């Protein structure tokens, strides 16, 4: 079974509390998602492998560390996942970015995929799938399905808020995928929204309804 971790860093929890509030403006919401994503990126990249490299400083030759192993890719689930991309890129600017577009059928609560645009070498990369919400788990499962169909094998899922139902569904469908979240909330309501949650992340990011 893959790792499941709630990242309880004080700065993340403080910013998440502001993010949840109904009074938080679109501008502030967007900035907070970016900031939390960057902080989470720092945490979820802790186990990236390193290798020795010889470099020359102005004073001497020395052996130091650099990232090794697979190159990185960030794959947001559209549209809300876009809000988390820049936070990750501020840490790993050389990472490539793919996109998986989905919308939720409001009657069945099931995701419908409408776009998959990925780096050609996606099968050779460590992938961070990002989406602010892990609700039913349907979108996350479909996104990982799409990646695995294209040969991807090293995948982590990163969200800001998760429901227990979504975590369980993703773990059952893809037990090899690590899941990271800033909060594990209580449940889903009858409309498939996370409680207490933070509302519709896409609408709040982009000022739409």
Curated annotation (Swiss-Prot):
Pathway: Pyrimidine metabolism; UMP biosynthesis via salvage pathway; UMP from uracil: step 1/1
EC number(s) from the headed UniProt entry: 2.4.2.9
Regulation of this protein's activity per its record: Allosterically activated by GTP.
Catalytic activity field: UMP + diphosphate = 5-phospho-alpha-D-ribose 1-diphosphate + uracil
Cofactor note: Binds 1 Mg(2+) ion per subunit. The magnesium is bound as Mg-PRPP.
List of residues binding uracil: 194, 199-201
Keyword terms, alphabetized: Allosteric enzyme, Glycosyltransferase, GTP-binding, Magnesium, Nucleotide-binding, Transferase
CDD domains, alphabetized: PRTases_typeI
Alphabetized SUPFAM superfamilies for the sequence: PRTase-like (SSF53271)
GO BP annotations, alphabetical order: UMP salvage; uracil salvage
Class of this enzyme: transferase
Binding site for 5-phospho-alpha-D-ribose 1-diphosphate: 79, 104, 131-139, 200
GO MF assignments: GTP binding; magnesium ion binding; uracil phosphoribosyltransferase activity
Cofactors demanded by this protein: Mg(2+)
Family: Belongs to the UPRTase family.
Function: Catalyzes the conversion of uracil and 5-phospho-alpha-D-ribose 1-diphosphate (PRPP) to UMP and diphosphate.
Protein name per Swiss-Prot or TrEMBL: Uracil phosphoribosyltransferase
Organism: Streptococcus agalactiae serotype V (strain ATCC BAA-611 / 2603 V/R)
